[in-house]
Structure formats: structure tokens, C-alpha cells
Swiss-Prot record:
EC number: 2.7.4.8
Family annotation (Gene3D superfamilies): Guanylate Kinase phosphate binding domain, P-loop containing nucleotide triphosphate hydrolases
Keywords: ATP-binding, Cytoplasm, Kinase, Nucleotide-binding, Transferase
Keyword ATP-binding: yes
Gene that this polypeptide is encoded by: gmk
InterPro entries, A to Z: GK/Ca_channel_bsu, Guanylate_kin-like_dom, Guanylate_kinase, Guanylate_kinase_CS, P-loop_NTPase
Organism: Clostridium perfringens (strain ATCC 13124 / DSM 756 / JCM 1290 / NCIMB 6125 / NCTC 8237 / Type A)
Recorded GO CC terms: cytosol
NCBIfam families found in the cross-reference section: guanyl_kin (TIGR03263)
Guanylate kinase-like domain residues: 11-189
Protein name per the record: Guanylate kinase
Length: 216
């Protein structure tokens, strides 16, 4: 009887970054709404919960002592201190979801993504690009929450961040959210078909199959 090829059912870690205004959040939201096997990682933080925020949904809220203990236990894929509070991506919860066959999205900044890349070598790193710098500028202006000074700061930062695109596996130009989502879906499908994501018994099962056909 023909043996089945056993595939690795482990999920794929998808790390998404890009400059402010590139549309990362909108793309991630669309992916989550469209696919029930894609989940977003919930970050941990030591800051106080805001009104309406739920522990384990918006963030994992920790004390500074708890956070530092997790750092000591190497339980973060990446972490940083921002304005006196700690933020990080819990390694154990991400690994649990991946082991359950769930595809996990990390929407994080570039520095965080590069730290994750050091630990998660099998991750898929996708950089979201705007169709043009002028379009990026207009998107940020439309938010209506930026002063001329902060707008210029964000724009200069975006120029610097785009230089990091070569550190990623893929670049997706977001000129249309639907098209950008389709490109990421294609990337995920291709990654699922990579030989190195199949279990080591792939060749063994094929050898057994050939042996059965030749000698049985």
C-alpha cells in the first residue's frame, strides 16, 4: 500500500514590518479577518492597561519584576524599553501556536524584526513598502494627527527604514490592500511547500514506497 508523505504541520511565523503609513496594520487586519488559521501574536508590556484593554487580548500585562524574570529566562523573541516601559514578544506563546499548526503574524518594528530573525531562522520576513514616498506622505497627512514637525520626523524616519528592506525575505508594495494581501497569501503558500518545512521522514517514506512497488 502506498505510504503517505508526512508533512510538517507546524505553522509559519510571519514577521511584517515597514515604515509608518505603509499600511501594515490594515494588511494584518485583513489577513486575520480572511483566514482562521492566521493569528497575531499578543505582545507583553509593563505599562498600565488603558480603558477597555483586556489582558491577553490587547497585551499581556506584566509587572516589571515579571518582565525582567522572563528576560532572564530567555522567554522573549525580542524586547525593548520605551519611555520607561518594557515591551516584548513572548517566545513561549508564539512557539505554542506554531506547534498547534497556527500561522502567527508579528507586526513589529524593524529593530525588533532583526532581533527575531536572530532567534527564529525559519521565520518569513516581509517588508511592506508604499507605492511611492509621495503616497506615504499623503497617507500620514490624512491621519490628521501629525504636526508639521512630527510629520517631517516620521518622513525622515521612513527614508531610513526603507534602507533595511534588503534584510527581509520579501518586499510587498502596498498600492492596494487587497492585492497586497494576495501577495502575502502567495508567499505563505510557497513557504508551506518548501522542502525544508517537510519532516525528515519525507525521503524515508518515498524509499519505503519504492521498495514496496519493486519487491512486494
Amino acid at each position: 500500500m502506498m505510504n503517505k508523505i508526512h508533512k510538517d504541520n507546524r505553522g509559519v511565523l510571519i514577521v511584517i514590518s515597514g515604515p509608518s503609513g505603509a499600511g501594515k496594520g490594515t494588511i494584518c487586519k485583513a489577513l486575520l479577518e480572511k483566514h482562521d488559521d492566521i493569528f497575531i501574536s499578543v505582545s507583553a508590556t509593563t505599562r498600565n492597561p488603558r480603558v477597555g484593554e483586556v489582558d491577553g487580548v490587547n497585551y499581556h500585562f506584566l509587572t516589571k519584576e515579571e518582565f525582567k524574570q522572563r528576560i532572564a529566562e530567555d522567554d522573549f523573541l525580542e524586547h525593548a524599553e520605551v519611555y520607561g516601559n518594557y515591551y516584548g514578544t513572548p517566545k513561549s506563546s508564539v512557539e505554542k501556536m506554531l506547534d498547534e499548526g497556527k500561522n502567527v503574524i508579528l507586526e513589529i518594528d524593524i529593530q525588533g524584526a532583526l532581533k527575531v530573525k536572530e532567534k527564529a531562522t525559519d521565520g518569513v520576513f516581509i517588508f511592506i513598502l508604499p507605492p511611492s514616498m509621495e503616497e506615504l506622505k499623503q497617507r500620514i497627512i490624512k491621519r490628521g494627527s501629525e504636526t508639521p514637525e512630527s510629520l517631517m520626523t516620521r518622513f525622515k524616519s521612513a527614508y531610513k527604514e526603507i534602507n533595511y528592506v534588503s534584510k527581509y525575505n520579501y518586499a510587498v508594495v502596498n498600492d492596494n490592500v487587497e492585492d497586497a494581501v494576495k501577495k502575502i497569501e502567495a508567499i505563505l503558500l510557497a513557504e508551506k511547500c518548501r522542502v525544508d518545512r517537510l519532516k525528515e521522514n519525507l525521503l524515508e517514506s518515498k524509499e519505503d514506497e519504492m521498495h514496496e512497488q519493486l519487491y512486494d
